């Protein structure tokens, strides 16, 4: 049976393969498995678990939120709804309110018809695989006895938790942004109101783009996966920096004054060097995923910074950071984790820390981005194949080995099944774009031939 949870929660087309019934069942199972330890959590010795619930702006978020809230309350959990909010705001609210766990409804950068469910454990941490598996197993079983009378959960709106998150973000900014002109692309998502508000409170001159909160247009030609309009706006508005978020604002990418993209690897490099300069980079180590560009590794090695590598997914980055006591980690895609201030990738926090570095150094972002030189990287998404056999195909293994031999020390190959979409990702880095592109296309053809979709 296909696993319900992917690398970042549950995702699917809302009302097709992510239904209200599933959302209610998942919420009930989560209370049963995560709720018991929280019944006595917090200074008030609560009689029932407390669960924080937030969502992005997608139209389907309303009925899925209603289903989740119903499942939680019917299973005996109190619910604190914070409404439309970034994913990291839910994680922060769980920790700040000493909640038992939290639920975020979002499909991140996916198109509008999709939606998803992310669950945060006590303290605001994403669930480990074994807990997600336990929730899936419980969902497959008949429902147990439900509370009655005064034992059912209560539901209340708690917008103040979002205000506490905004205050927390501003407290993590080391300097004011008074002289910076910033364009922020909110992707019509969860940060549409909050990101411009926080940046203005920090002193920046803000031009908000795709920030109406129109969930029907979430991620449509905007945000971290569609940077063209942001690049144009930065140049047209003579801005210093452009900031892009995705639908749930757990990611941040940037654009410099010339309209050039600054990706997650470059942001990490800038922040790692800044922390190291201040003696605040624990063990002089940064944590990244296997997708990180070789140029990042080269730059960190030259700076005397150790790089720890994990599988794709910011929760794996966080797990490695917590295990090693590290404070900075992230992904090329723009998930950046400042573990002293957050428990998950936080796009707004990342934007503030990046802009703070621009402000405190007085250097343009384009100059700071020279902290690393990216090797040409080509990513090909191969659809319509059996992604479950990526690691077991002899034909594919042979093709990868041959490509790696050709590239030598000047490049690398990575093939992996997506954890959030039905496809296989082929990534190649090389010393020239032409070599990377040719190698990636040849490997993609082998993937199509070796991994035909099951009939």
UniProtKB/Swiss-Prot annotation:
UniProt remark on cofactor binding: Binds 1 Mg(2+) ion per subunit.
Active site: 108 (phosphoserine intermediate)
Binding locations of Mg(2+): 108, 246, 248, 250
Cofactor(s) needed for function: Mg(2+)
Entry PTM: Activated by phosphorylation.
One BP term from GO: peptidoglycan biosynthetic process
GO cellular component annotations of the record: cytosol
Signal peptide: none
Pfam hit, one: PGM_PMM_I
Free-text function comment from the UniProt entry: Catalyzes the conversion of glucosamine-6-phosphate to glucosamine-1-phosphate.
Name of the protein in its database record: Phosphoglucosamine mutase
Organism of origin: Frankia alni (strain DSM 45986 / CECT 9034 / ACN14a)
């Amino acid at each position: 049976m296909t696993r319900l949870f992917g690398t970042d929660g549950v995702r699917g087309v809302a009302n097709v393969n992510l239904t209200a019934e599933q959302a209610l069942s998942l919420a009930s199972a989560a209370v049963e498995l995560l709720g018991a330890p929280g019944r006595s959590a917090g200074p008030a010795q609560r009689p029932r678990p407390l669960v924080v619930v937030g969502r992005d702006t997608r139209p389907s978020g309303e009925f899925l939120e209603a289903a989740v809230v119903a499942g939680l309350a019917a299973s005996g959990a109190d619910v604190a709804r914070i409404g439309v909010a970034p994913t990291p705001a839910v994680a922060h609210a769980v920790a700040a309110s000493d909640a038992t766990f939290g639920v975020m409804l979002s499909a991140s950068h996916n198109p509008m018809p999709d939606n998803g469910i992310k669950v945060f454990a006590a303290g605001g941490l994403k669930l480990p695989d074994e807990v997600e598996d336990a929730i899936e197993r419980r969902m497959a079983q008949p429902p147990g006895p439900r509370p009655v009378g005064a034992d059912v959960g209560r539901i209340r709106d708690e917008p103040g938790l979002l205000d506490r998150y905004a205050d927390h973000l501003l407290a993590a900014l080391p300097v004011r942004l008074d002289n910076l002109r910033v364009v922020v692309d909110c992707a019509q998502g969860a940060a549409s109101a909050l990101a411009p508000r926080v940046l203005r409170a920090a002193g920046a001159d803000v031009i908000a783009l795709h920030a109406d909160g129109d969930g029907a247009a979430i991620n449509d030609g905007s945000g971290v996966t569609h940077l063209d309009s942001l690049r144009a706006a930065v140049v047209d508005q003579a801005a210093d920096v452009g900031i892009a978020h995705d639908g749930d604002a757990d990611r941040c990418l940037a654009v410099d004054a010339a309209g050039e993209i600054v990706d997650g690897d470059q942001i990490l490099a800038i922040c790692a060097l800044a922390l190291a300069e201040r003696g605040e980079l624990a063990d002089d180590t940064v944590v990244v995923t296997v997708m990180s560009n070789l140029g990042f590794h080269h730059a960190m090695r030259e700076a005397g910074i150790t790089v720890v590598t994990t599988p794709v997914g910011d929760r794996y980055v966080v797990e490695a950071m917590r295990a090693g006591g590290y404070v900075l980690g992230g992904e090329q895609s723009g998930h950046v984790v400042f573990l002293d201030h957050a428990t998950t990738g936080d796009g707004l926090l990342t934007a503030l820390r990046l802009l703070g570095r621009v402000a405190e150094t007085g250097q343009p972002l384009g100059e700071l981005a020279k902290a690393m030189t990216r090797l040409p990287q080509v990513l090909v998404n191969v659809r319509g194949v059996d992604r479950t056999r990526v690691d077991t195909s002899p034909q594919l293994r042979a093709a990868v080995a041959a490509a790696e031999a050709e590239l030598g020390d000047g490049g690398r190959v990575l093939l992996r099944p997506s954890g959030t979409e039905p496809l296989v990702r082929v990534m190649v880095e090389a010393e020239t774009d032409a070599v990377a592109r040719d190698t990636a296309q040849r490997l993609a053809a082998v993937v199509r031939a070796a991994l035909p979709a099951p009939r």
